[in-house]
């Protein structure tokens, strides 16, 4: 037989049943609503002391208010957030579409560029079609194109990237060319701009006249006739002398250059740097190559003080004298030299001497004795 325990023990051991869940779950309350409910509960507890009837009425009223107020008293921030999010939905879609369009445009641009570049290098436009020359005066255009080693029909950009090499070929072959600038001319053609050295003088040789450039180089080509207006350099057999002379000559004023007709190399025993500069006004200037640019600056002042053409000596100082004085000095020197050379040399072994005054008639010792007796 089972022993029935006390009713109180049975009720103590029985666990309380969990509250039944409402079919419709209530929305989560905000902190404001929770405080409101706590406030209502306090009022309900106070009203309970006054009477059950009043408590019931107050409870019913408060419950109705609590059910109506959650929607009426929602925080303004939550409502605004929902409104802002709804407003941003179209903007988000537009932003995404713009990004997609940009990426698509970038990809299409890259593909289109690659296709165009490939088509360009396959087409004849990427090959050199023509070469023209401008600025050349002394060298023919066809000779310049030929010596440049540029090839029509070959790659345009490959040759353009190596344009310095082709310019060097031209300058190496033609010393008169100072610069050869290769640049694009149109879609697939080149233009060579030539800048030449000026021919400032002529070097006189047995075969003719060689042009002398402003940088001191002497060209190998010869001309039979001298070009008017260009000074003539004579007796410059050493190659290094002309570049030294041109370094000083280029520093002269233009009016002095125009007044020079000829320059001769005239070294002395003691001075290997001496030259004679012949002027168009008839004067002759004696000066060192190294002093040419410095001392020739005073030539105009000295020439104005001269009464007639003569010599301007600038070897040591600066002074002038007429040609007659030089001829007298030269004549005296020549007479002294001729007297020394014409002295009779008697050979003791020679018995006969030739007298030019007697047309080669021999003179013996008997004639000498007759002359002595007379």
Swiss-Prot record:
Residues that span the membrane, as ranges: 104-124
Keywords: Cell cycle, Cell division, Cell membrane, Membrane, Transmembrane, Transmembrane helix
Region annotation Disordered: where it falls in the sequence: 1-90, 325-374
UniProt keyword Transmembrane present: yes
Domain POTRA: start-end pairs: 126-197
Function: Cell division protein that may be involved in stabilizing or promoting the assembly of the division complex.
Protein name, entry field: Cell division protein DivIB
Gene: divIB
């Amino acid at each position: 037989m089972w022993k029935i325990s006390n009713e109180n023990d049975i009720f103590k051991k029985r666990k309380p049943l969990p509250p039944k869940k409402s079919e419709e779950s209530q929305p989560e309350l905000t902190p404001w609503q929770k405080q409101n409910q706590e406030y209502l509960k306090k009022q309900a507890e106070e009203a309970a002391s006054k009477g059950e009837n009043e408590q019931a009425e107050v409870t019913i009223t408060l419950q109705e208010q609590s059910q109506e107020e959650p929607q009426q008293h929602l925080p303004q921030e939550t409502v605004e957030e929902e409104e802002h999010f709804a407003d941003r939905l179209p903007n988000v879609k537009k932003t995404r579409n713009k990004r997609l369009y940009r990426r698509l445009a970038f990809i299409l641009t890259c593909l289109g560029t690659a296709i165009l570049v490939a088509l360009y290098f396959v087409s004849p436009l990427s090959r050199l079609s023509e070469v023209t020359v401008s600025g050349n005066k002394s060298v023919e255009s066809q000779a310049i194109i030929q010596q440049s080693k540029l090839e029509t029909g070959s790659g345009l950009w490959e040759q353009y990237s190596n344009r310095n090499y082709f310019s060097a070929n031209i300058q190496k072959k033609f010393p008169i060319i100072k610069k050869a600038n290769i640049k694009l001319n149109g879609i697939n053609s080149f233009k060579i701009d030539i800048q030449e050295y000026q021919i400032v003088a002529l070097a006189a040789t047995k075969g003719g006249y060689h042009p002398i450039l402003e940088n001191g180089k002497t060209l190998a080509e010869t001309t039979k006739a001298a070009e008017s207006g260009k000074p003539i350099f004579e007796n410059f057999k050493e190659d290094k002398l002309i570049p030294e002379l041109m370094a000083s000559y280029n520093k002269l004023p233009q009016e002095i250059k125009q007044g020079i007709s000829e320059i001769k190399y005239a070294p002395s025993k003691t001075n290997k740097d001496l030259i004679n500069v012949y002027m168009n006004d008839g004067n002759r200037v004696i000066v060192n190559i190294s002093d040419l640019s410095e001392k020739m600056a005073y030539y105009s002042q000295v020439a104005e003080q001269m009464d007639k053409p003569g010599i301007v000596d600038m070897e040591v100082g600066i002074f002038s004298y007429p040609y007659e004085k030089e001829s007298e000095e030269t004549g005296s020197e020549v007479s002294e030299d001729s007297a020394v050379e014409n002295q009779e040399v008697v050979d003791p072994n020679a018995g006969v001497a030739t007298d030019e005054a007697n047309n080669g008639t021999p003179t013996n010792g008997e004639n000498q004795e007759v002359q002595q007796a007379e």
